C-alpha cells in the first residue's frame, strides 16, 4: 500500500515522513491552513529522496501558474481540487491527480471520464478543499472497476484507528492523510509513523 502525507509545511516533518516509509508528500499551494510558499516547498523538495513523489495541491489555479510552480519547485505531480476539466489537464502536460468529493456510487463513473494518472476520492468539500478530517461512507467505492481501483487514492478523515477498515473496504492504490496525523493542527511525526506502519501492514 502506498502512503501520501499531505499538508507538509516544514523540513523536519518531510524528512521524518520519508524515513518512516512515505511514498508521496503533498504541498498545498491553495488557500488552506496548511498552505506553503513555493520558496519553502522548493527548499524541502530539494532535500527529499528521488523516489518519493512530490505532489502540489491546487484549486482552480491557472495552467501557467501551476506549470511555473511545478518547474520551479521540482514537483513530480499536481493534484487538482477545483473544477478543472480535461482541456486544462491536457494543457498542463504534467502527471496529475483529480480530486473528487464522494456523495454516491455514481461518482465512480464520473471519475472514469478524467484523463489523469490518478483519481483521489475525498469527502465533499467544506470551507477548504480537502484536509477537513471527515470520512465518507467507504462502501460507496466497494464495487469499483479494477482499472479505476488501480489508480485510486483514498482520502478523507483517515487516521490510525480507521485506516485498516478503509483499506479493506476500498482496496485503493494509495491512501492520503493530512489532519489524521496532526495534533492541535500540527503534523505529529509519531502519528505519521504509526499511520504508515498500519497502512502498509494491513495491505500485505
Swiss-Prot record:
Keyword Isomerase: yes
CDD domains assigned: PRAI (cd00405)
Domain of life: Bacteria
Keyword flag Cytoplasm: no
Family annotation (Pfam families): PRAI
Regions that span the bilayer: none
One Gene Ontology molecular-function label: phosphoribosylanthranilate isomerase activity
InterPro entries: Aldolase_TIM, PRAI_dom, RibuloseP-bd_barrel, TrpF_fam
EC number, as in UniProt: 5.3.1.24
Reactions accelerated catalytically: N-(5-phospho-beta-D-ribosyl)anthranilate = 1-(2-carboxyphenylamino)-1-deoxy-D-ribulose 5-phosphate
Record's keyword terms, sorted: Amino-acid biosynthesis, Aromatic amino acid biosynthesis, Isomerase, Tryptophan biosynthesis
GO biological process terms, semicolon-separated: L-tryptophan biosynthetic process
Similarity section: Belongs to the TrpF family.
HAMAP family xref list: PRAI
Name the record gives this protein: N-(5'-phosphoribosyl)anthranilate isomerase
Organism: Bacillus cereus (strain AH820)
Gene behind the chain: trpF
Amino acid at each position: 500500500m502506498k502512503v501520501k502525507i499531505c499538508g507538509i509545511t516544514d523540513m523536519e516533518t518531510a524528512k521524518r515522513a520519508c524515513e518512516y516509509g512515505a511514498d508521496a508528500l503533498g504541498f498545498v499551494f491553495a488557500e488552506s491552513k496548511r498552505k506553503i510558499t513555493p520558496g519553502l516547498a522548493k527548499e524541502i523538495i530539494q532535500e527529499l529522496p528521488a523516489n518519493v513523489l512530490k505532489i502540489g495541491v491546487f484549486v482552480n489555479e491557472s495552467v501557467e501558474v501551476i506549470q511555473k510552480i511545478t518547474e520551479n519547485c521540482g514537483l513530480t505531480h499536481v493534484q487538482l481540487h477545483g473544477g478543472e476539466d480535461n482541456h486544462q489537464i491536457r494543457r498542463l502536460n504534467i502527471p496529475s491527480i483529480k480530486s473528487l468529493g464522494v456523495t454516491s456510487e455514481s461518482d465512480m463513473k464520473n471519475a472514469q471520464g478524467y484523463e489523469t494518472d490518478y483519481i483521489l476520492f475525498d469527502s465533499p468539500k467544506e470551507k477548504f478543499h480537502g484536509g477537513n478530517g471527515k470520512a465518507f461512507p467507504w462502501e460507496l467505492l466497494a464495487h469499483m472497476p479494477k482499472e479505476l481501483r488501480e489508480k485510486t487514492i483514498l482520502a478523507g478523515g483517515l487516521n490510525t484507528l480507521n485506516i485498516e477498515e478503509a483499506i479493506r473496504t476500498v482496496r485503493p492504490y494509495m491512501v492520503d492523510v493530512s489532519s489524521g496525523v496532526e495534533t492541535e493542527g500540527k503534523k505529529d511525526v509519531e502519528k505519521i509513523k504509526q499511520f504508515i506502519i498500519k497502512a502498509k501492514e494491513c495491505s500485505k
